[in-house]
Design a protein with these regions (language model features):
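Detector for outer-membrane/organellar transmembrane beta-barrel domains
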Residues: 142-222
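Short loop/turn motifs that connect adjacent beta-strands in outer-membrane beta-barrel proteins
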Residues: 67-79, 118-126, 158-165, 199-210, ...
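Residues that define the transmembrane beta-barrel architecture of outer-membrane proteins
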Residues: 56-64, 76-78, 104-110, 143-149, ...
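Transmembrane beta-strands of outer-membrane beta-barrel pores
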Residues: 45-51, 84-92, 118, 132-138, ...
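Residues on the lipid-exposed face of transmembrane beta-strands in outer-membrane beta-barrel proteins
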Residues: 62-68, 110-118, 134, 149-157, ...
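Transmembrane beta-strands of outer-membrane beta-barrel proteins
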Residues: 78-84, 126-130, 147-149, 163-171, ...
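Outer membrane beta-barrel transmembrane domains
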Residues: 88-102, 203-282
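Short glycine/proline- and aromatic-enriched beta-strand/turn motifs that initiate or cap beta-hairpins
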Residues: 23-96
Length: 282
C-alpha cells in the first residue's frame, strides 16, 4: 500500500510538471494578469496547476472539513467545510525539484460552507450544499466575493464482490462579484461514473479501495477567464479523469476529515489542469 502511495505522489509531480511545461508553449496569449483570474475557478480548483493561454496559475489549497453529525446519528448528515487557497502566477512547479520556491503570493481566498447528506434509499444519496467567501489579489487591489450552491447526487448502479459502480451528478449555481464590478453568475452540470475496487489492504486503520472516476462538466453559458472578453479563454465544457485511494469510513485528523486522496487531470482544449484532491465534487 505504501508503494501505491509513493506511485500516486510521483504521478502527481509528473503530471504537474507536464502541465507547467505545456503553459510555456501555448500559442494563445493573455494581455494582463487580471485576464487569468476567474475567482471561482481558482478558489475551487484544488491543489495543482492550471493553464490558460500562455499563463499558468499554481494553486495550494488547504481543504478543512468536519462532520457536525453523521447519517448514523439521526438519518441526516451535516458537514462544515472551509477551503483556504493560495495562488501563484507563472510559477512552474517543476522548479521545486531544483530547490526553487515561489517568493511572492499572488492571490488568497477563503471559502467556508456547509453540506447536508440525505439518504433517499440504500442506493441513492443526495447532498445539498452552500459556500460563500472572498478572494483577494495581493499584488493589487483586485478582490471578489465568491459563492456557490447546488445539489450532489450519488446512485449505486451495481456491486459485485466489493466492487461498486455508481452514477454521480452535481448541479451547481455559482458566481463571483469583483470589486467595483457586477456579479458574474453561471451554472454547470457535472456527471460521471465512480468505480471503486477493493485492494484487500488497510491504510491507517481503514480498508482501502482504488477509485476511477471519469467526469464530464457542461457550463450552461460560456465560463470566462478573460476579463476583457478574450474568446480564447472561455469554457463551455470540461473533461476530467480522477484516480484515488479511498475508504468507506473517513480518516480524521482533528478538524480535517477526508475519505479519499487522489489526482485529477482536467482539460477543455483551451484550459488544462491537474490537481490533488481529498474529496470528489459529488
Amino acid at each position: 500500500m505504501f508503494t501505491l502511495l509513493r506511485c500516486l505522489v510521483t504521478a502527481v509531480a509528473l503530471l504537474i510538471v507536464l502541465c507547467s511545461a505545456q503553459a510555456q508553449v501555448q500559442p494563445k496569449t493573455v494581455s494582463d494578469r487580471q485576464d487569468l483570474i476567474n475567482w471561482y475557478y481558482a478558489a475551487t480548483f484544488g491543489t495543482g496547476v492550471y493553464t490558460a493561454g500562455d499563463r499558468s496559475v499554481s494553486v495550494l489549497q488547504l481543504p478543512f472539513s468536519h462532520a457536525i453529525k453523521t447519517v448514523a446519528d439521526d438519518g441526516i448528515g451535516l458537514k462544515f467545510k472551509l477551503a483556504a487557497t493560495l495562488g501563484f502566477y507563472d510559477y512552474n512547479v517543476d522548479s521545486v525539484f531544483g530547490g526553487s520556491v515561489p517568493d511572492r503570493l499572488s492571490t488568497f481566498s477563503v471559502l467556508p460552507g456547509v453540506e447536508w447528506e440525505f439518504p433517499l434509499s440504500r442506493r441513492w444519496t443526495i447532498r445539498p450544499y452552500f459556500d460563500a467567501g472572498v478572494g483577494q489579489q495581493l499584488a493589487g487591489r483586485e478582490s471578489a466575493w465568491i459563492y456557490d450552491f447546488g445539489v450532489k447526487s450519488r446512485f449505486l448502479l451495481g456491486e459485485d464482490q466489493g466492487v461498486e459502480f455508481a452514477l454521480v451528478n452535481s448541479l451547481t449555481s455559482a458566481g463571483y462579484r469583483p470589486r467595483g464590478g457586477p456579479t458574474r453568475p453561471f451554472s454547470y452540470f457535472a456527471t460521471g461514473l465512480d468505480l471503486t475496487i477493493p485492494t484487500g489492504h488497510e491504510l491507517f486503520g481503514r480498508t482501502a479501495f482504488i477509485g476511477f472516476t471519469p467526469v464530464y462538466i457542461n457550463y450552461f453559458s460560456r465560463f470566462g477567464f478573460a476579463e476583457f472578453r478574450d474568446s480564447n479563454n472561455k469554457l463551455r465544457e470540461e473533461f476530467e479523469l480522477a484516480v484515488s485511494i479511498l475508504a468507506r469510513k473517513p480518516w480524521s485528523l482533528k478538524l480535517f476529515d477526508f475519505d479519499r486522496i487522489g489526482i485529477a487531470v482536467r482539460s477543455s482544449g483551451d484550459v488544462t489542469g491537474v490537481s490533488l484532491f481529498t474529496s470528489l465534487p459529488f
